[in-house]
Curated annotation (Swiss-Prot):
Molecular function per GO: structural molecule activity
Protein name (Swiss-Prot/TrEMBL): Flagellin
Keywords from the UniProt entry: Bacterial flagellum, Secreted
Subcellular location per the Swiss-Prot or TrEMBL entry: Secreted; Bacterial flagellum
Amino acid sequence: MKVNTNIISLKTQEYLRKNNEGMTQAQERLASGKRINSSLDDAAGLAVVTRMNVKSTGLDAASKNSSMGIDLLQTADSALSSMSSILQRMRQLAVQSSNGSFSDEDRKQYTAEFGSLIKELDHVADTTNYNNIKLLDQTATGAATQVSIQASDKANDLINIDLFNAKGLSAGTITLGSGSTVAGYSALSVADADSSQQATEAIDELINNISNGRALLGAGMSRLSYNVSNVNNQSIATKASASSIEDADMAAEMSEMTKYKILTQTSISMLSQANQTPQMLTQLINS
């Protein structure tokens, strides 16, 4: 037995340090709910989790982008629906006005309402916007003809959706079923029977054009909706993978904390006894 160096005490102190460290780590994991709280816990795991968190954050942003794109297209579609309803009323007026039994005085009433509806068509086309992006008017210089939606967390992964130029139907030309062309809806009239007949045919083409435009918007909304589901599923899977690496097993950590707590208490008791060994040797020598 040696007196100058208390080997048992030194070993017990080291065990006490390790047991206290294990108990502290278990307590930290229980408090945070995470198995990895620093690179010391698992450097490789932390690197993987960081990459996964970056990816899931990007996917969540892409989901919001697509949802905003759907909102934008729904705004445009709603406006086109209003324009279609207006055109249907205009067609009704044109059909009524084409009746030869009406006098010019009778047609003045139709003309007044018909003209106000033309102005409302322009108003809808001019003012429909989403976040200051004009959705139905491509006549201005620099006007947007399509919107680009960032579809995923990868750079330049874009979904391009063409916008419908409803304003172009106002001053442009309309090709009728007969192959002839007439001016846009702003030039239509129900002032007499002939112009009313022509307006009826032109409005049919306008309604058909708007229906085609709505179909394109609907296709865009459908694609964006599927993209939302896709990126959401990817995000959920990525978060689940990160969780399996990063999150703590609470039951296991509680068991670890209890184990190290008992070992720490035992180490303290053993250290107290180990520190008394030199005194016991001295008493033995003196006796």
